[in-house]
Swiss-Prot record:
Annotated PANTHER family: NADH DEHYDROGENASE SUBUNIT 1, NADH-UBIQUINONE OXIDOREDUCTASE CHAIN 1
Lineage, top ranks: Bacteria, Pseudomonadati, Pseudomonadota, Alphaproteobacteria, Sphingomonadales
Pfam family, one: NADHdh
UniProt catalytic activity: a quinone + NADH + 5 H(+)(in) = a quinol + NAD(+) + 4 H(+)(out)
Membrane topology, record value: Multi-pass membrane protein
GO BP annotations, alphabetical order: aerobic respiration
EC number: 7.1.1.-
Assembly and binders: NDH-1 is composed of 14 different subunits. Subunits NuoA, H, J, K, L, M, N constitute the membrane sector of the complex.
Keyword Cell wall biogenesis/degradation recorded: no
Gene Ontology MF, one: NADH dehydrogenase activity
Protein name in UniProt: NADH-quinone oxidoreductase subunit H
Length: 348
């Protein structure tokens, strides 16, 4: 992109700066539009499962409800508690929002449709996603209130616990694909299952890892049945209790952007990314980014369905599941997959 702006007569510094801003906008604007749509889908799915209609007034079929809510919170007053640490209190939602957007830079939406196609893309996503807990801890501490503080401590313990098992699961994928590059991981899944299925989910060794990864994503994003950081009956609204206006909205945008990010990682790592489900020539006439969007939104639908139907875990059950079930299982499969690859000589 820098070369394109240089052809317009800009020197290298201005071309690089303009290309960087353009790249940020190319990622941020579509992600924000997608977040607005998935919030609408989330509310519609919850309404349907609860035998309600969901949003249906603002715009056709209620499609503009998210934009109306965004305008409402934008016009509201930002209220800061008198005992709060003002600087950190206002910085926390910004950190959560920015971290959720930055990780999208390496996600391939299609063949060549990636902002930064780096060789350590998976490692980058893992590192960036683990920073999201800082915004939550900052919010809980700066609010100077017991409910947000308890929520922040829960969030920190929960995210750290499941990051470990997610790390081992991703090692399994990297061992099989032979690369950290997300685009190359997608290409490695072409015709992987019986020579016709595009995706690692068909692999008898990697399918259990996908199940663990999907459940870990629910815990990582604090979604039901692991939404203990926002347990209304215990913690009011959790770390968001003292927030209002755009500060509250930034937390919501960051939360849903992070959910979409992990849904897209499910697509890229286990379900063939932009590749069609079956390696059949007519299916390749459908643009790759459409396959990517369809798979990602199907995963988001699963998130919403689980949120509406599965009861919340107790906190001790959550910790036990992470440390006594997921961690040993993921570590066991690292050894199993490593042994299989060494025995068969199959790498990448």
């Amino acid at each position: 992109m820098t070369e394109f702006f240089q052809t317009l007569g800009m020197n290298y510094e201005w071309a690089w700066f303009t290309a960087t801003i353009a790249g940020i906008l190319l990622i941020a604007l579509p992600v924000m539009l997608a977040v607005a749509m998935v919030i609408y889908v989330d509310r519609k799915v919850l309404g349907a499962i609860m035998l309600r209609r969901g949003p249906n007034v603002v715009g056709p079929f209620g499609l503009l409800q998210s934009f109306a809510d965004g305008l409402k919170v934008f016009l509201q007053e930002t209220i800061i508690p008198s005992a709060a640490n003002k600087g950190i209190f206002l910085l926390a939602p910004i950190v959560t929002f920015v971290v959720a957007l930055v990780a999208w830079a390496v996600i391939p939406f299609g063949d060549g449709m990636v902002l930064a196609d780096i060789n350590v893309g998976l490692l980058y996503v893992l590192a960036i996603s683990s920073l999201g807990v800082y915004g939550i801890v900052m919010a809980g501490w700066a609010s100077n209130s017991k409910y947000p503080f308890f929520s922040a401590m829960r969030a920190a313990a929960q995210m750290i616990s499941y990051e470990v098992s997610i790390g081992f699961i991703l090692i399994c994928v990297v061992l099989w694909a032979g690369t950290f590059n997300l685009s190359e991981i997608v290409e490695a899944q072409r015709g992987h299952g019986l020579g016709i299925v595009n995706g690692y989910f068909f692999n008898i060794l990697l399918f259990p890892m996908w199940v663990l990864f999907f459940i870990s994503c629910l815990a990582e994003t604090q979604r039901a049945p692991f939404d203990l950081t926002e347990a209304e009956s215990e913690l009011v609204a959790g770390y968001q209790t003292e927030y209002s206006s755009m500060s509250f909205a930034l937390f919501w945008l960051g939360e849903y952007a992070n959910i979409l990010l992990l849904c897209s990682l499910n697509t890229v790592l286990f379900f063939g990314g932009w590749l069609p489900p079956i390696d059949w020539a007519p299916l390749y006439y459908v643009p790759g980014f459409l396959w990517f969007l369809i798979k990602t939104f199907l995963f988001f639908f699963m998130f919403s369905w689980i949120w509406a139907t599965v009861p919340r875990y107790r906190y001790d059950q959550l910790m036990r599941l992470g440390w006594k079930v997921f961690l040993p299982m993921s570590l066991l499969f690292v050894f199993l997959i490593s042994g299989y690859l060494m025995a068969t000589g199959h790498y990448g």
